[in-house]
Amino acid sequence: MHYARTFETRGAYQFGSVNRVMLHASGPWAGGTVGLHVMGSAELLTLGARGAPQLLQVAFHADGGTVTDHVHPSPWLMELAGSYDAVLSEDLSISLYAAAIGEPALGPPVYLHRGSAAANPVVPLAHHLQDDTHSSYGVVTYGMRWPGLDLEVSAFNDRQPEEVGPVFFYDGARLDATAGRATIHAGKEWKVFGTYGYTPATTGGHAHDAQHRLGLGALHDAEPWSLSVIYGANNPVGAEGPRHSVLAEAQWNSPTGDALFTRVEYVQRTADELALVGSISAIQDIESMQIGYSRAVAVRGKVMGRLGGYVTVNLTPPQLTPFYGTSVPFGTAVYGEVTLVGRSVR
């Protein structure tokens, strides 16, 4: 459960719950390992269709209107997928991933699965420039792994419903978006990745022109620290150039389960994404800084209870000041969290 509050002209407040349940099962089959992956959420009930307050997040449709400065709720089902992994030789293994709803090989690991954001309940502002394809309605991915190198290619459907709500959405579905990702394992603690994808023009939720997406990043995981530095850009076909984003986030974990987390972002927003079309320049440069702390207050077996909070401070250009009432709009939240077997419900 959380109490979230954003301030100034576009501020809002909410009592609600950010929550997710992830289930994974695996077993031997046909000389390899077959897996089932399911992830769901009840945020449409616990947050409502308008989601949670978050300044400068991408506007979306809900209840027949446009919602600004909120993050949309997660859909009922975010992943329903099967996988197959097999070792072909001492130096080569392969994988096949097929999903009715799932994540293609585009961008970094989605923020939900990064160690550097494990205790952070906030969706990055750069989400729509880096990893927003994580719940695509139709994905097929083939991967090959050598010591120190992973290569993956995906075909997927990038169309989304007009509003969050349908469990499945396949109107006009085609696997006509493509993506590839290369990941270098620099020792046991560092991963460096590069990614490219092409998505055709879509309507509905997350509507966009045909575009290319580029991404680069490095991830470090070694207790007590996890760190991610990520660059992502969308380059619409026919545009003057790409829109850029840079994210750096880190988390420190104490031996008792406490966590200190932080995130710094630079994002280029379009006027359309802020629902301010015609009144400001087409592209706006935004910076955001966040710091938070999560304290373990109870541990019983594999269940851990936490209390946490965070503060987010944003820096906006002068053209946005009349709409936000300040050049430094900010927000804060306090929350209680229950974690079960390494997964969390907030």
Residue ranges and their predicted role:
Residues M1-R5, L36-A42, L96-A100, A155-N157, ...:
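Transmembrane beta-barrel strands of outer-membrane/channel proteins
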